[in-house]
């Protein structure tokens, strides 16, 4: 057999040594560099080093947690994400880390279907709450995400999970329990070419929130035509979390707007951030426009409890149980309510039943986006009476025979149990 030239063998040895040195250097740097608690680029808390215990070692949970920790704390994580996304895009891959690179530059987060148990628990917590407060009008607006409304902009052959069977099942179960489901899918679909979702973020734009508000106002008995708005651009450099999560469109910047009433006679509201013991006379914290998380301009981000009071002739009080999608919509509702109490169950740890009495709540509105609504567990815990114990949830049936299609499915639900 003919021997390889010495130069070739030398090149192979050198390459192997350099690669080994590189791996060793990265391991050492990962060990020496302090952990980061928060990723400004991804706008999320990063996983900290997990504690070791015998039970976690036996169950394998420690290994899973440690893998997540290493992934979050890896040296130059943001750079590696962008590099991988660039390489994947060159190879023709249009999906990275659960985010699709769609047409017209849209990044769309895939929908993770909830387990049947998760769906049952969330919906039954809401129907049980409705039964305990059957004297109050209750509404639910579960906003569809871009992957639903802008499905025509998904890349070819994208296997996106259909949200519609789950929204239909939720609507049927809630309506049966007396909770009015505010379905904004048709409204948003009619305006899908009007910039209702950000290109680089998972939120709807203020324009999208406004269209949803117009539909919600009809259900709430609000004359939305009584106030006209002007759209005011407040930033031209917004870059959302989907860009950071996927690495796609890393240099993309887009416009962020607010809607301001044209009529100066519209009463001003006072916003009370209860946990922070801070009051302001604006829905917007413009200092956030100088940060990575520009969407936090709306109500300074997410808080456990925020109380909005408005000197209006209306004597209505509204409890909004919400996620961040509500933040850009609530300013449209404020002029029509004497008091709006916003509760984000992810950060709220008090007794919701007591809050209902103290704040003299007259109406209840759930305002979520579908991705958060079907994955978060905090809503169930917040709605549960503090003295209650776990029970077997009733079944909320979904017709998901084709979860990648755009067709809706019929749904039904059993009677809720306490």
Q: Positions of the model-derived regions?
A:
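Extracellular glycan-modifying ectodomains
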Residues: 1-418
């Amino acid at each position: 057999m003919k021997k390889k030239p010495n130069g070739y063998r030398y090149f192979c040895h050198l390459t192997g040594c350099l690669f080994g040195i590189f791996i060793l250097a990265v391991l050492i740097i990962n060990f020496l560099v302090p952990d980061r608690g928060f990723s400004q680029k991804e706008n999320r808390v990063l996983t900290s080093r997990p504690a070791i215990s015998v039970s976690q070692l036996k169950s394998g949970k420690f290994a899973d947690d440690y893998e997540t920790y290493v992934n979050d704390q890896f040296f130059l994580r943001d750079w590696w994400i962008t590099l991988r996304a660039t390489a994947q895009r060159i190879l023709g891959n249009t999906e990275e880390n659960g985010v699709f690179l769609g047409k017209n530059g849209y990044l769309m987060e895939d929908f993770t279907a909830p387990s049947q148990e998760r769906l049952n628990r969330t919906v039954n917590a809401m129907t049980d709450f409705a039964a305990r407060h059957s004297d109050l009008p209750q509404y639910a607006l579960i906003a569809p995400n871009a992957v639903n409304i802008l499905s025509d902009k998904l890349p070819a052959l994208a296997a996106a999970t259909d949200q519609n069977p789950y929204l239909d099942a939720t609507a049927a179960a809630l309506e049966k329990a007396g909770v009015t489901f505010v379905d904004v899918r048709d409204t948003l679909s009619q305006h899908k070419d009007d910039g209702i979702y950000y290109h680089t973020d998972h939120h709807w734009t203020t324009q999208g929130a406004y269209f949803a508000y117009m539909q919600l106002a009809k259900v709430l008995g609000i004359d939305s035509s009584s106030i006209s708005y002007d759209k005011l651009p407040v930033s031209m450099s917004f870059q959302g979390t989907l860009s950071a999560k996927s690495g796609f469109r890393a240099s993309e910047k887009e416009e962020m707007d607010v809607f301001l009433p044209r009529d100066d006679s519209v009463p001003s509201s006072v916003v009370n951030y209860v946990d922070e013991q801070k009051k302001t006379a604006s829905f917007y914290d413009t200092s956030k426009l100088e940060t990575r998380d520009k969407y936090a301009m709306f109500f300074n981000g997410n808080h456990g409890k925020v109380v909005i009071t408005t000197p209006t002739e209306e004597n209505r009080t509204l409890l909004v149980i919400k996620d961040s999608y509500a933040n850009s919509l609530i300013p449209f509702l404020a002029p029509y309510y004497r008091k709006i109490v916003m509760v984000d169950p992810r950060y709220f740890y008090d007794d919701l039943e007591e809050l209902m009495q103290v704040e003299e709540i007259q109406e209840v509105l759930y305002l979520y986006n579908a991705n958060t609504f079907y994955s978060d567990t905090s809503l169930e815990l917040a709605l549960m009476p503090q003295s209650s114990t776990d029970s077997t949830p009733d079944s909320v049936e979904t017709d998901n025979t084709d979860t990648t299609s755009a067709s809706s499915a019929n749904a039904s639900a059993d009677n809720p149990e306490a």
